[in-house]
Amino acid sequence: MVTAASGRCGFTPQRREPRGSPCRCPRLPARRRRPGTDTAAAAVAESPQELQAFRDYGESWYRSRKGLESRFQPREPLARQPQVTAEARCKLVSWLIPVHRHFGLSFEALCLTVNTLDRFLATTPVAADCFQLLGVTALLIASKQVEVHPPSLKELLALCCGAFTVQQLRNLECIVLLRLGFDLSAPTISFFLEHFSQVRLQAEGADAAEAADARILAGGISELSLADYAFIGYAPSLLAAGSLGLADRLLGHRRPLDLRVSGYPEELLRDCMEQLQLLVSLNGQSLPLLLPPEVVQKCPWLRGGR
């Protein structure tokens, strides 16, 4: 079992204060901003070169990533965890969501973080006192994959109330990489959201504004699903298609995405959308915090949550 106190993550930390859940960590300082990511229009804004690249390679890249889903999807990651529960996982991922936003990281980085976390949990028992450290370690590994400027070790550890050392973080990073065989490039919900949104824009008479709003709302719904263990068995491509379908429905779009592009049977898509609808209804106060104001204004049923 990987623990902090036993030194398997490094040296025993010098505890300056009692270590609690992630929610007890200090308030996040001012958020870094990624240029062009805070508006709905930015969700689908692409250069002519990028659009042409999608036309040339988008479908083959999609088939390649979809073919890898089963290989990277963890199976019951908590089955071997005597100390980590679904509730603890929910709290950790719910904490990582604002942390990744604070650092200005992409949704792709968050998806890879949760995938790395779950795949490691499926292979290795983790002690409760090491779980938060595992979360920031997974975030660090994911950020190194897809971000130009990943957060520093010092920045990440500062969010853990000084409970862990740099050496512990480095040691756990090595353990995670070894257990996963350095096999990290998992297909993500983020990738499939972008792909289906681009497919939508290629259709005749596509409404770019509707596509942008649906993409952003679907992204918020997908973030909520990452924290809910009930969605662990859903493939990323299915969650992406279901989130976009639900977003179109909630926004009352006249030209919704044709969900047949996902290749999933109608009944499977319907089940996924129903589960996501329940998730949204249970998180009416949280979802607006994940969305820009201009999208919230188009969702009357969400305005009370702001």
Where are the regions a protein language model picked out?
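Acidic, serine/threonine-rich low-complexity regulatory regions at protein termini
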Residues: 1-306
